[in-house]
UniProtKB/Swiss-Prot annotation:
GO terms for molecular function: mycothiol synthase activity; protein-N-terminal-alanine acetyltransferase activity. GO terms for biological process: mycothiol biosynthetic process. It is an enzyme of class 2 (transferase). It comes from Mycobacterium sp. (strain JLS). This is Mycothiol acetyltransferase. Acetyl-CoA 1 binds at L79, V80, V81. Pfam families: Acetyltransf_1. Residues 4-140, 151-300 form the N-acetyltransferase domain. Belongs to the acetyltransferase family. MshD subfamily. Catalyzes the transfer of acetyl from acetyl-CoA to desacetylmycothiol (Cys-GlcN-Ins) to form mycothiol. The lineage of its organism: Bacteria, Bacillati, Actinomycetota, Actinomycetes, Mycobacteriales. Keywords: Acyltransferase, Repeat, Transferase. Its EC number is 2.3.1.189. 1D-myo-inositol 2-(L-cysteinylamino)-2-deoxy-alpha-D-glucopyranoside binds at D36, E178, K219, E227, Y269.
Length: 300
């Protein structure tokens, strides 16, 4: 019988096994079962770790990460079970344990909201409380970039840019469960990632004051896929077309980076209920590719 136990920290071997399970699930399902932040948490002790071990196989077969509540987000769980060990009730048992540990307001992500996740949600009596759209478009036939008078575009020059980057990010995303409330450590963690490229972090400055108005952080996933990782505009600078300017600047950069691909594509994530942003991205040629759903127990 599969054993399921909480850990305050993971061994190096457990971390390696979990990364292998995530990779296997991604290949099998066509969608990553957990977000990048979960992988960053594996060596840390900021979150709780629920590990499923199959005694016959003598191996880790499932993992749930439980992030505690923050000022902007409820407790959030993310879950993966190895494809070879599914349909045994492990996923449902781990989801039940994670939500119970997280408390009344805890949620659990279903990346791609696949049928297996929907079935588990029905079994546990969960309902969708939040949806995140993944939108994509080809990196071809891009509109030209237009920069307003008084605005200067530059790329990230190093940690000296961080105070302004944090100011704009936390103003633009004060409401956001994951993107809001960033600190120096959040930027430093991403700067340490293998994918980080300072030439792909675009910043728009006000010529007169020198203040940062907005930024676009791009990410390259592989030879065929790039991402609009974060676009943030200072609320005080809204209405100047900066969102479109920064987005298109990043798209042209990604198109150049992926120029050897026969089908270069860019993706982004946006809240399903952010109608204005969804409309903007549709105007830029993006269409919905998949939907991530956050589930929770909802009182009658």
């Amino acid at each position: 019988m599969t054993s399921i136990d909480w850990r305050s920290a993971l061994t190096d071997d457990e971390q390696g096994s979990i990364r292998d399970i995530v990779a296997a699930a991604t290949r099998h399902d066509g969608v990553a079962p957990v977000g990048d932040q979960v992988l960053r948490e594996l060596p840390a002790d900021r979150t709780r770790h629920l590990v499923a071990v199959d005694p016959d196989a003598g191996a880790v077969v499932g993992y749930l990460n439980l992030a505690p509540a923050s000022d902007t987000a409820p407790p959030m769980a993310e879950l993966v079970v190895h494809p070879d060990f599914r349909r045994r009730g492990t996923g449902a048992a781990m989801a039940r344990a994670g939500l119970a540990e997280g408390g009344t307001h805890a949620r659990i992500w279903a990346h791609g909201n696949l049928e297996a996740a929907r079935a588990t949600a029905r079994t546990l009596g969960l309902q969708v409380v939040r949806e995140l759209l993944q939108m994509r478009r080809p990196l071809t036939d891009l509109p030209p970039v237009t920069v307003a008078d008084g605005v200067r575009l530059a790329t990230y020059s190093g940690p000296g840019d961080d105070p302004e980057l944090l100011r704009v990010n936390n103003s633009a995303f004060a409401w956001h469960p994951e993107q809001g409330g960033w600190t120096d450590a959040d930027i430093a963690e991403r700067r340490a990632e293998a994918w980080f490229d300072p030439a792909g972090l675009f910043m728009a400055f006000d010529d007169a004051s020198g203040k940062l108005l907005g930024f676009h952080w791009t990410k390259v996933h592989g030879p065929d896929l790039g991402e609009v990782y974060v676009v943030g505009v200072d609320p005080a600078a809204q209405g100047r077309g900066l969102g479109a300017t920064l987005t298109l600047t990043g798209l042209h950069h990604l198109a150049e980076r992926l120029s050897n691909s026969p089908q270069p594509t860019v993706m982004l994530y946006v809240e399903a209920d952010n109608g204005a942003a969804v409309k903007t991205y549709r105007r830029l040629g993006f269409d919905v590719s998949s939907v991530d759903a956050a589930y929770a127990a909802v009182a009658d």
